[in-house]
């Protein structure tokens, strides 16, 4: 309509006819229907159309070519006479005020075409000139006939016309200026947008170049790596060839060497691993792929500047649109660069870029400029806007526009989304909640809880209506939830139906209500208690239901206010159904097992939901495994497929299987194949037939290491965590074999019935197993390639060319090749990586030639040669003579080694082997510093030696021999029935000996019955194993001992492997050290050479230790620099500060220039750990001392009284003289290293490093004895007063053995409380052999022997008790001191507050007569055969009543039937009023507070401590004991004494401590039992109903305990070997 309006034009006659029709001068004003302006009817500047609507001229700007005017409101046409040229301009005289108000932008918006405006103005000028002429020609007549007023009126009209022309000229001038500015701005925007595109292309070009350069660099690095690998292999092969030539030159050496082993070594070091080197292939030439023609075509048509017409002008609406457009344009200018569609995915709609595009709807005019880039569609189709088409900008009016528009493809199926399954009815009816709505769910939960907790309960008169929204306290979901009432059942017999409202009930009339949880999907049934069962149907019982007395407590009615708050949160539960599956048995419906398995796979985890369609509000979906980069999940690839595989469902059409699994199935790397026409060493692992069998390459023990790791992992792993619910074809997995061991496998068949067919990829055999024996494979086990290579024998075919191999041929081939080491000659590599091979038996004697298995089958008539095959010539090859090699030297040295002096080897033995690569066999690994190796050439020697020893000792008889350390012997290995040479390390007991089998490097403990004297002729041969240690590494964690993890890892990695060692030259001495320092290299599973030391460092099990050669004396720093006396050290520091003062430097920096720098250099150099002098023991047998501390191991540290003053003096001098030590560089502390320690009290002490634990160091304060773990920054590696011996002396009690041979924690606690800071008398009994060892003493405190004291309380056992009982003679000073210290005051004992009533002991409970079975409860376990029991509650109550009848204690006021528990409850309520306990006699009854804060009956056992006072009490009703302070004891009310003590101490019959108990941890107070036995007994007694039978009467109660099945409770201990039967 706008286009049609733009084609109309104004005409003089039309305006004259319509504007002046029968309208006299001075008529009333009319109002424009469109803009509302009021125009005088006399002015003629209005148009009254035939339809009756009136418009001003400004609202009807028309061209001369138009013949009709279309009404903008009703669209009725009005004819116009274009031949008349009259155009009235007088009307502008009265409209000047309006024109002044029109802003330039408004004029511009109203104007549609500059040319049209100029034409209109020209017409106006012509009309004005014509009017002037008419006035001049008629002036004479007018003067005669008209008055002067008419002339003035005409002049006034002309004056206003002139002013109007001036205004129009100014408007044109402004439009010209605006147009120029607009052109410049549009050009600027276009340049900016295209500059962004150019920047994008430049960035893309850089990214392409960088990506190509990176890819090329990676490829070149692989080539360089392969090249270096080839050079290394060439060097290794050259060395091996030299060894072989040497053996040929010296035939005598063949008797001592295994020629087959040498040949196999040659093959292993060359051809067997070249396959890995040949993996880098020449890649395809790079090529840049750019669709230039399409891009150029798009650029040629990209962007268009349009001028769109508009005939309507709405100033207010236009202003709003401009503001919105401006915001949108600014946003798009920022995002245009990033959102530009990829060229390969977008297509441009050519119709948009040409003039053929249909005109857009009319919009207000604007000047904003944008780029237009619409997507291509096929040229045959016209681009249409789909619901998914998003226009980036709204369509514009007549203005230069450049539009960006993006078209999004409409997918057939929606993309996957993460969801949670909230409720499952069956696989075709379940509810989900979206993962993206988690925040909404939390907000909803918070709002609902706030409303429900704040609102009041329902009133019984409230009305409940079906379908109404309600809030309910959900049982299953555990929160307040939104719900919908789905069923209401009234109480029987009441008129519950309301008139005209059959679905409404009062709350008090409801018997049963069912509510559907709209946010979870489940339904819950609330049943009113007492309702007749007829109201409850089976479907109600199947759902979550609960019986309530009052429904008002769990229901809240929804209010309009709450609905308004929650209206934005739609129900979160979405009903879903799995696509295209039905129950396995359609007649019976879904089984419960299907729901259980469904929940098992999806419960409590996020899964990926793929939506296919929607039917009646239900989503048809499939639940799948989420993407790995989002959430780790055990979800199967497809839940539908899993249910079908488990035979719980079936497809409507069996062709509807998901193809998603093909892209997610894990696969192994294919096996590494040897090259054609090469020979490799193999083992045949599985045989189907001579034309179908599998072999493994012998590349080391990596396959064994892999298999062992897999077995250990899956044997200990929880099976359900890695269970495969739905296997797919060719899926990599781990499967259990019939031997119970887990191996790598892949799925090759799905026969159904919960079974899968798998192939073991490392062996080649197949098996059909259940799904329970299949597990997911870990990533680290997936990286290794398959080990089994499929092969077929070359040159031969089934006998007489039959189609299949005979059974005899298969059996014969298995007999010759199955599980044997063989040499394989690869003839050709067939399709599907099948090798065509010839097998040779390589286990013959050295002088025998190898035999071909292929030929043997033909000779035995089990196979035939292929047609055209030519027999080979088996002529003997030329024998070459090789040069001598290092191995020949090794063989000679093995014979020359002296086994007796193996730890002081002469230099010439290994001098020639230093820094050479020597092949060895790792026979035993104990730790990184103790590794036993054998030369590869000693295998024959070891076999020969074993034969000699069997001949010498097989029938020998044992004779008593007095064995001593370092004696040589012959040792029989019982489990292997072998004899080995050995050397005694130590005598463990009289019958057990620890020996070293030095030919194989094994240490073990054997019985002396297995030892024989070693004959002299068997000593002539040297040791066949060497002890080595890895260099350049040290234990991690700061300790000087290797961790068990490091030892186990190294043993698993090296034991039994063939490796290469390089003997390292000792940098300090020329003599050979022992163990031999070596570097060990071996091959990993990828065939790469690995340095074992670096391997341990990489695993974090070791740290690198530098080996730095000794510096010259001129460059070394004397260690005495670390021992500068502190006075001198302080002066040196002061001088440094004076002579090198620099205001810009800190003091520490100045010191470091001259002194600290040298100290730091000393730290980094190899250092010898130095320490302080050992303690000086007083030269007297008896001396006084102060106990400084008691160590955790029971060591008593004492400081002699005579040395205390010197210790205080030295400590003060250290604090006053030790100033600034500077900042310490990173320092590696060693165990035993002396240092200066800054303690927790900020004082400096002398110390010694005990252990390095992470970033902290455990140090010992040498002059005080105690240890502490402190940060490394509080240590400094200097010696303080190194000439002064250590002040504190470590001591141990003489001839005193603690329980369990080590001081137990409770004994350590007693020693610490008893001796800390106490003055004691020391009697020296035995001086230590090493001055750093403990001094053996007798210690007396206040005349009491410490050994006797500890033995009395059964913390230890001690000899010479009669000597210890003698008290030390006391002088008069001691007696005076004792009297002063023990001054007795008894005034306070007479006060009334301390009066304690005399109470009788507790009554004891009695057991039934012997032989009677009665129920008991075990209250406390002292040891496995000593417990406290009480009779069952009924019998206890009866006994309590019997005692209360006979009780004449005078206590009254309580009910005779009150039980003990009730009485204690009443006492606990007013325990604050009870008086404190003041009488601490043994067996004194009292009330004691237990750990639970309640008070129970107890009695005093002993006083444990005096400062503070601690009392040991026993709870008489339970048997347990506790050490309590005074505030936890009070006097017992007398009425509680009438109840007998419930706990009865009994001994258990039927078992006793075992004679041989290997448990290391003993019960401290009962060392004959182990802690393991105690815990096992507690497990047997806990949580069971027990019965007892008395075996012996009081005083020593002995009973036998039985469980509820009448079995003795101690039998599990006997079966576990923790106890022996007591007959």
UniProtKB/Swiss-Prot annotation:
Which Pfam families is this protein grouped with?
TUDOR
* Tudor domain boundaries: 726-784, 962-1021, 1228-1285, 1479-1539
- Tissue specificity statement from the Swiss-Prot or TrEMBL entry: Testis specific.
Keyword DNA-binding set for record: no
Q: Gene3D superfamilies from the entry?
A: 2.30.30.140, 2.40.50.90
Subcellular locations according to the entry: Cytoplasm; Nucleus
For this UniProt record, give its keywords in alphabetical order, as a comma-separated list: Acetylation, Cytoplasm, Developmental protein, Differentiation, Metal-binding, Nucleus, Repeat, Spermatogenesis, Zinc, Zinc-finger
GO BP annotation list: spermatid development
Q: Which InterPro entries match?
A: RNF17-like_TUDOR_rpt1, RNF17-like_TUDOR_rpt2, RNF17-like_TUDOR_rpt3, RNF17-like_TUDOR_rpt4, RNF17-like_TUDOR_rpt5, SNase_OB-fold_sf, Tudor, Znf_RING
The GO molecular function terms of this record are: identical protein binding; zinc ion binding
As stated in the Swiss-Prot or TrEMBL entry, residues carrying the post-translational modification N6-acetyllysine are 234
| Stretches of the chain forming a coiled coil according to its record | none
Q: Which GO terms describe its cellular component?
A: cytoplasm; nucleus
The record's annotation in SMART domains points to: TUDOR
Where do the segments described as Disordered lie? 1-22, 1438-1462
Q: Principal localization?
A: cytoplasm
Chain positions of all zinc fingers (RING-type): 32-75
Subunit text = Interacts with MXD1, MXD3, MXD4, MXI1 and PIWIL1. Self-associates.
What is its biological role? Seems to be involved in regulation of transcriptional activity of MYC. In vitro, inhibits DNA-binding activity of Mad-MAX heterodimers. Can recruit Mad transcriptional repressors (MXD1, MXD3, MXD4 and MXI1) to the cytoplasm. May be involved in spermiogenesis.
**Could you tell me what this protein is called?**
RING finger protein 17
Supply the source organism for this entry.
Homo sapiens
The taxonomic lineage of its organism, from the top, reads: Eukaryota, Metazoa, Chordata, Craniata, Vertebrata
Which gene carries the instructions for this protein?
Answer: RNF17
């Amino acid at each position: 309509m706008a286009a049609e309006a733009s084609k109309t034009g104004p005409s003089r006659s039309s305006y004259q006819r319509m504007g002046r029709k029968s309208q006299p001068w001075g008529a009333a004003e009319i109002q424009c229907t469109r803009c509302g302006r009021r125009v005088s009817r006399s002015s003629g500047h209005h148009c009254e159309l035939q339809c009756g609507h009136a418009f001003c001229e400004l609202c009807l700007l028309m061209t001369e070519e138009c013949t009709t005017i279309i009404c903008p409101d009703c669209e009725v046409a009005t004819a116009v006479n274009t031949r008349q040229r009259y155009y009235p301009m007088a009307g502008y005289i009265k409209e000047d005020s309006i024109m002044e108000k029109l802003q330039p932008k408004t004029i511009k918006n109203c104007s549609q075409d500059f040319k049209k405006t100029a034409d209109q103005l020209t017409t106006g000028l012509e009309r004005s000139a014509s009017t002037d002429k008419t006035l001049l020609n008629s002036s004479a007549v007018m003067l005669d006939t008209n008055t002067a007023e008419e002339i003035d009126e005409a002049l006034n009209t002309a004056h206003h016309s002139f002013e109007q022309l001036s205004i129009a000229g100014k408007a044109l001038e402004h439009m010209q200026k605006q147009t120029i500015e607009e052109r410049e701005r549009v050009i600027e925007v276009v340049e900016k947008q295209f500059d962004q595109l150019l920047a994008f292309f430049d960035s893309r070009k850089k990214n392409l170049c960088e990506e190509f350069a990176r890819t090329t660099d990676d490829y070149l690095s692989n080539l360089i790596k392969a090249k270096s690998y080839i050079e290394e292999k060439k060097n290794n092969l050259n060395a091996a060839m030299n060894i072989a030539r040497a053996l040929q030159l010296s035939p005598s050496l063949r008797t001592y060497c295994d020629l087959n082993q040498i040949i196999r070594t040659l093959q292993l070091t060359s051809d067997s691993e070249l396959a890995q080197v040949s993996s880098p292939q020449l890649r395809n030439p790079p090529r840049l792929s750019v669709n230039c023609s399409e891009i150029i075509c798009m650029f040629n048509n990209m962007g268009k500047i349009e001028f769109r017409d508009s005939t309507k002008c709405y100033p207010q609406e236009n202003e709003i649109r401009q503001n919105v457009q401006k915001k949108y344009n600014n946003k798009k200018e920022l995002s245009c660069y990033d959102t530009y569609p990829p060229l390969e995915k977008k297509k441009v709609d050519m119709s948009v870029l040409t003039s053929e595009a249909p005109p857009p709807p009319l919009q207000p005019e604007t000047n904003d400029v944008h780029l237009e880039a619409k997507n291509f569609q096929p040229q045959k189709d016209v681009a249409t806007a789909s619901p998914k088409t998003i226009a980036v900008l709204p369509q514009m009016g007549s203005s230069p526009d450049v539009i960006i528009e993006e078209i999004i493809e409409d997918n057939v199926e929606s993309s996957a989304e993460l969801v949670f399954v909230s409720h499952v009815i069956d696989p075709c009816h379940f509810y989900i909640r979206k993962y993206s709505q988690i925040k909404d769910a939390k907000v909803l939960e918070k709002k609902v809880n706030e409303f429900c907790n704040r609102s009041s309960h329902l009133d019984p008169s409230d009305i409940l209506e079906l379908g109404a929204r309600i809030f309910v306290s959900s049982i299953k979901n555990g929160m307040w939830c939104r719900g919908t009432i789905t069923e209401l059942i009234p109480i029987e017999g009441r008129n519950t139906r309301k008139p005209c409202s059959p679905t409404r009930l009062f709350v008090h009339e409801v018997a049963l209500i069912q509510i559907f949880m709209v946010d979870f999907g489940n339904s819950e049934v609330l049943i009113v208690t007492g309702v007749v069962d007829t109201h409850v149907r089976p479907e109600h019982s199947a759902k979550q239901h609960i019986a309530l007395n009052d429904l008002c407590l769990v229901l809240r009615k929804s209010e309009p206010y709450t609905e308004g708050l929650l209206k934005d949160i739609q129900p979160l539960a979405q009903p879903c159904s799995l696509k295209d599956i039905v129950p396995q048995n359609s007649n019976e419906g879904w089984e419960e097992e299907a729901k259980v398995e469904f929940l098992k796979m999806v419960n409590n985890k996020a899964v990926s939901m793929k939506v296919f369609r929607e039917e009646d509000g239900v989503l048809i979906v499939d639940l799948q495994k989420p993407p790995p980069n989002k959430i780790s999940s055990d979800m199967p690839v497809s839940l539908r497929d899993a249910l079908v595989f488990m035979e719980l469902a079936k497809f409507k059409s069996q062709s509807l299987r998901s193809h998603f699994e093909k892209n997610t199935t894990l696969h192994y790397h294919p096996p590494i194949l040897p090259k054609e026409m090469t020979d490799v060493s193999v083992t045949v692992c599985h045989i189907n037939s001579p034309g179908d069998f599998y072999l493994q390459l012998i590349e080391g023990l990596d396959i064994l290491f892999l298999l062992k790791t897999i077995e250990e992992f899956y044997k200990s792993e929880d099976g359900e965590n890695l269970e495969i619910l739905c296997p797919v074809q060719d899926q990599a997995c781990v499967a259990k074999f019939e031997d119970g061991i887990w191996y790598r496998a892949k799925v090759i068949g799905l026969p159904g019935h919960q079974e899968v067919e798998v192939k073991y990829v490392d062996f080649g055999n197949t098996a059909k197993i259940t799904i329970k024996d299949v597990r997911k494979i870990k990533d680290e086990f997936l990286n290794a390639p398959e080990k089994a290579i499929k092969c077929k024998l070359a040159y031969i075919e089934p006998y007489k060319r039959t189609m299949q191999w005979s059974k005899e041929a298969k059996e014969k081939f298995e007999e010759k090749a199955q599980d044997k080491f063989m040499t394989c000659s690869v003839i050709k590599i067939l399709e599907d990586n099948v090798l065509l091979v010839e097998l040779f038996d390589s286990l013959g004697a050295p002088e025998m030639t190898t035999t071909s298995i292929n030929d043997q089958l033909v000779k035995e008539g089990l196979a035939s040669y292929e047609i055209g095959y030519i027999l080979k010539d088996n002529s003997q090859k030329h024998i070459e003579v090789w040069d001598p090699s290092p191995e020949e030297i090794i063989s000679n040295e093995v014979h020359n080694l002296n086994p007796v002096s193996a730890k002081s080897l002469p230099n010439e033995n290994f001098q020639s082997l230093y820094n050479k690569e020597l092949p060895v066999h790792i026979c035993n690994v104990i730790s990184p510093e103790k590794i036993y190796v054998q030369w590869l050439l000693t295998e024959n020697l070891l076999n020969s030696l074993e034969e000699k020893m069997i001949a010498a000792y097989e029938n020998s008889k044992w004779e008593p021999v007095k064995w001593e350390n370092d004696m040589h012997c012959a040792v029989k290995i019982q489990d292997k029935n072998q004899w080995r040479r050995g050397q005694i390390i130590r005598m463990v007991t009289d019958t057990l000996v620890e020996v070293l089998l030095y030919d194989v490097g094994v240490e073990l403990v054997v019985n002396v019955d297995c030892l024989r004297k070693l004959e002299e002729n068997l000593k002539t041969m040297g040791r066949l194993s060497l002890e080595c240690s890895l260099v350049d590494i040290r234990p991690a964690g700061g300790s000087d001992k290797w961790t068990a993890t490091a030892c186990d890892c190294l043993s698993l990695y090296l034991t039994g492997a063939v490796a290469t060692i390089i003997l390292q030259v000792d940098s300090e001495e020329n003599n050979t050290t022992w163990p031999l320092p070596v570097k060990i290299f071996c091959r990993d599973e990828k065939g790469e050479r690995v340095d074992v030391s670096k391997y341990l460092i990489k695993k974090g099990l070791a740290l690198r230790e530098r080996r730095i050669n000794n510096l010259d004396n001129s460059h070394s720093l004397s260690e005495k620099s670390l021992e500068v006396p502190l006075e001198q050290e302080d002066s040196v520091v002061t001088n440094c500060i004076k002579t090198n003062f620099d205001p810009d430097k800190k003091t520490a920096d100045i010191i470091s220039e001259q002194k600290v720098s040298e100290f730091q250099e000393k730290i980094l150099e190899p250092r010898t750990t130095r320490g302080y002098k050992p303690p000086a023991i007083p030269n007297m047998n008896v001396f006084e001392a102060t106990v400084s501390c008691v160590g955790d191991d029971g060591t008593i540290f004492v400081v002699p009284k005579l040395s205390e003053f010197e210790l205080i003096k030295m400590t003060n001098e250290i604090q006053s003289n030790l100033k600034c030590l500077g900042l310490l560089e990173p320092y590696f502390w060693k165990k035993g290293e002396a240092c200066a320690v800054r303690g927790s009290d900020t004082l400096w002490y002398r110390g010694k490093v005990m252990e390095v634990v992470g970033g902290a160091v455990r140090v010992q304060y040498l002059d005080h004895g105690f240890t502490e773990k402190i940060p490394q920054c509080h240590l400094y590696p200097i010696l303080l007063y190194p000439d002064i011996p250590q002040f504190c002396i470590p001591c141990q009690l003489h001839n005193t053995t603690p329980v369990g041979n080590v001081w137990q924690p409770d004994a350590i606690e007693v020693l610490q409380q008893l001796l800390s800071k106490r003055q004691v008398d020391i009697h020296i009994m035995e001086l230590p052999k090493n001055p750093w060892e403990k001094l053996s003493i007798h210690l007396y405190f206040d005349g009491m022997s410490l050994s006797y004291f500890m033995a009395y309380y059964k913390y230890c056992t001690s000899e010479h008790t009669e000597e210890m009982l003698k008290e030390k003679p006391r002088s008069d000073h001691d007696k005076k001191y004792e009297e002063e210290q023990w001054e007795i005051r008894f005034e306070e004992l007479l006060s009334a507050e301390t009066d304690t009533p005399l109470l009788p002991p507790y009554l004891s409970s009695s057991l039934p007569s012997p032989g009677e079975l009665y129920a008991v409860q075990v209250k406390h376990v002292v040891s496995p055969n000593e417990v406290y029991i009480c009779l069952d509650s009924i019998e206890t109550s009866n006994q309590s009543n019997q005692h209360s009848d006979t009780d004449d204690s005078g206590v009254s006021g309580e009910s005779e039937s009150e039980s003990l528990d009730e009485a204690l409850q009443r006492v606990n309520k007013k325990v604050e009023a009870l008086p404190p306990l003041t009488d601490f006699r043994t067996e004194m009854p009292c009330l004691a507070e237990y750990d639970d804060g309640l008070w129970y009956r107890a009695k005093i056992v002993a006083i444990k401590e005096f400062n503070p006072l601690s009392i040991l009490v026993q709870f008489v009703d339970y048997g347990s004991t506790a050490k309590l302070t005074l505030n936890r004891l009070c006097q017992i009310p007398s009425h509680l004494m009438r109840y007998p003590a419930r706990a009865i101490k009994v001994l258990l019959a039927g078992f006793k401590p075992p004679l041989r108990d290997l448990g290391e941890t003993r019960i401290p107070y009962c060392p004959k039992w182990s802690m393991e036995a105690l815990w096992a007994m507690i497990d047997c007694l806990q949580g069971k109903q027990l019965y007892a039978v008395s075996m012996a009467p009081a005083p020593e109660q002995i009973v036998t305990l039985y469980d509820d099945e009448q079995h003795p409770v101690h039998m599990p201990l006997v079966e576990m070997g923790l106890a022996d039967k007591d007959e």
